[in-house]
Amino acid sequence: MSETEATGVTDDSAPAIETETVSDAMEHTAIGVVESVEGAIEGAEKWVGDLQRTVKESKDTAMRSARSLRENSTSQFRSIQDFIPHALTQYKTYENAFFSKVTDELIYAKEHPAAAIGIGVAASLVLMRGPRRFLFRNTLGRFQSEEAQFLKAEKHVQELNMSVDLMKKESRKLLERTALAEKDMKRGLSELMNSGNDIHRLAKSVHKAECEAADLMDGLRQIPGRDAIKLRAEVASMTSLLRQKRIALNKRIMGMSDLGVSV
C-alpha cells in the first residue's frame, strides 16, 4: 500500500483542501472585521448619545440657572420697590420731627432769652479746648485711677520727647543752612565790596579822562583849520561817551551804598 493510499488523500484532492482552508481563513477574517466595525459603531453611537445627554443636561442646567437668576432679580427688585415708599415715609417722619424740634427750640429761645444765652455760653465753653479740658479734669478725670493717669502722662511725655527730637533735627538743619547762607553772604559781600572799589576807581579814571578831554577840546578850539575841527568833533564825541559812562558808574555806586555796602 502506498503513502497516499494509507493517508486517504490523493493528489487530486490536495488543491481542494487548500482552497477550503483559505476560504475558511478569509471567512474568519471577514467576521472579525465586521465585529470590529460593529464594536466601533456601537462605541461611536454610545459617545454620541453621551454627548447629546451632556448637552441636554448643560442646557437644562443653564435654563434653570437663568430662571433662578431672573426670579431672584425680580424678587429683589420687588423688595426694593416695596422698601422705597417705606424709606421715604421714614425720611419724611424724621425730617418733620427734626424741623419741629428746631422750631420748638427757636420758639423757646425767643421766649426765654436768658436761658438761651446761658446755654449758648455753656456750649461755647464746652467746645473750646481749654475749658473742656478743665471740666474733664475736675469731673470725669477724678474718677480715673492713678495708674491710668500715670500712663496717660507717660504717653504725653513720649509724644513731647518725639516732638522735641523732631524740633532738634529741624533746628540743626536750619542752623547748618543758615551757616552756609551766612558764609555765602560774607563771600558775596566781600566780592561786592571789591567790585565797588574797582567801580569807584574806574569812575575816578573816567572823570580824569573826561577832564583831560575837556582840556584838549579847549586847546583844539584855539587851532584853526579843518583838521582841528575834525579832531574837535572826535574829542567831543569821546567826551560825551566818557560822561555817559561816568554817570552810569556813579548810579551803580549809589545803588551799592543804598544796600549798605561802603564803597
Curated annotation (Swiss-Prot):
InterPro entries: RGS1-HXK1_interactor, RHIP1
Keyword terms: Developmental protein
UniProt KW Nucleus keyword: no
Biotech uses: Proposed as a reliable reference gene for normalization purposes.
Domain of life, source organism: Eukaryota
Summary of the function given for this chain in its UniProt record: Required for some glucose-regulated gene expression, being a physical connection between RGS1 and HXK1 in sugar signaling. Prevents roots and inflorecences growth.
Name listed for the protein in its UniProt record: RGS1-HXK1-interacting protein 1
Gene source species: Arabidopsis thaliana
Gene, per the UniProt record: RHIP1
